[in-house]
């Protein structure tokens, strides 16, 4: 329980922000879960000072039908390399409900 962060200490952008940082293996499992749900991965990024707004920039189009965790990770890293100072998040778009099934910040900007 000591690993849970105080909600006032850092900005929060989604549910996982209240937990300790995810390691690479936990990140892979979250991406695999998103794909296994049939959701389409999409990548978004934004400057840290604008992170609390509703509108983040989309990195390319959502990866419709993508089944490879490694491909999603490669795109996340490419977005982070192209925008190193930005927050980068992964969104799982649910075709059936026409909504976001999941969204979490993968890389935090400075």
Swiss-Prot record:
InterPro entries xref list: RuBisCO_ssu, RuBisCO_ssu_dom, RuBisCO_ssu_sf
Keywords: Calvin cycle, Carbon dioxide fixation
GO MF: ribulose-bisphosphate carboxylase activity
UniProt keyword annotation of S-adenosyl-L-methionine present: no
CDD domains referenced in this protein's UniProt entry, alphabetically: RuBisCO_small
Signal peptide stretch: none
The keyword Kinase appears for this protein: no
GO biological process: one example: reductive pentose-phosphate cycle
Coiled coil: none
The protein's assembly and partners: Heterohexadecamer of 8 large and 8 small subunits.
Function according to Swiss-Prot or TrEMBL: RuBisCO catalyzes two reactions: the carboxylation of D-ribulose 1,5-bisphosphate, the primary event in carbon dioxide fixation, as well as the oxidative fragmentation of the pentose substrate. Both reactions occur simultaneously and in competition at the same active site. Although the small subunit is not catalytic it is essential for maximal activity.
Note: The basic functional RuBisCO is composed of a large chain homodimer in a 'head-to-tail' conformation. In form I RuBisCO this homodimer is arranged in a barrel-like tetramer with the small subunits forming a tetrameric 'cap' on each end of the 'barrel'.
Family recorded in the similarity comment: Belongs to the RuBisCO small chain family.
Protein name: Ribulose bisphosphate carboxylase small subunit 1
Organism: Acidithiobacillus ferrooxidans
């Amino acid at each position: 329980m000591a690993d849970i962060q105080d909600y006032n200490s850092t900005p929060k952008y989604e549910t996982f922000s209240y937990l300790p940082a995810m390691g690479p293996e936990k990140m892979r499992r979250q991406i695999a879960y998103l794909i296994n749900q049939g959701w389409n991965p999409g990548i978004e990024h934004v400057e840290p000072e604008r992170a609390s707004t509703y509108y983040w920039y989309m990195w390319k189009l959502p990866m419709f039908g993508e089944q490879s965790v490694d491909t999603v990770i490669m795109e996340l890293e490419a977005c982070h390399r192209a925008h190193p100072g930005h927050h980068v998040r992964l969104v799982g778009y649910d075709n059936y409900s026409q909504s976001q099934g999941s969204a979490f910040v993968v890389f935090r900007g400075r």
